[in-house]
Amino acid sequence: MKLTAEDKHNVKAIWDHVKGHEEAIGAEALYRMFCCMPTTRIYFPAKDLSERSSYLHSHGKKVVGALTNAVAHIDDIDTAFSKLSDKHAEELMVDPANFPKLAHNILVVLGIHLKPHFTYSVHRSVDKFLSTVAYVLASKYR
Ligand code: HEM
């Protein structure tokens, strides 16, 4: 999926409002995913996945931090996510069908919390960006 110049502009603009809130946004997106799509929990055995757990918050910060890095390298997400894709494919062995599930929940959280900035065109651009991230993350699977 090709991100247009307008998409890149929209994603960078909304990400200015994400920066500094990576942990809260990430934790809520993960919590919603674990709640609404409970099969995703199987990759986190023995972890405390409750709403206020320190694990959920620290992991959420890492996930959205990685997205902040992808936004900073929006012209070359493949390279920016190369190691992360390897890790999910080779080490964590996460079924790539799960990536769009987290992408969906991140989109929901941004829509709720950044509503004034979440115009139709920003919605479309962020959806395309997260779909690209999910696609790139799945690219090392063979
Ligand atoms: C670890 C990002 C989707 C399962 C990680 C890490 C990052 C990350 C940054 C930490 C890597 C490290 O410490 O070296 C992302 C992004 C995703 C995504 C950006 C999609 C938008 C998923 C999904 C699952 C998953 C959908 C499973 C349902 C895991 C697991 C770990 C991990 C099990 C290891 C957790 C731990 O060490 O405690 N991910 N991830 N990821 N991810 Fe993902």
Swiss-Prot record:
InterPro entries: Globin, Globin-like_sf, Globin/Proto, Hemoglobin_a-typ, Hemoglobin_oxygen_transport. One of its GO terms (molecular function) is organic acid binding. O2 binds at residue 59. Keywords: Heme, Iron, Metal-binding, Oxygen transport, Transport. Heme b binds at residue 88. Pfam families: Globin. Red blood cells. Involved in oxygen transport from the lung to the various peripheral tissues. Major hemoglobin is a heterotetramer of two alpha-1 chains and two beta-1 chains. This is Hemoglobin subunit alpha-1. It comes from Pleurodeles waltl.
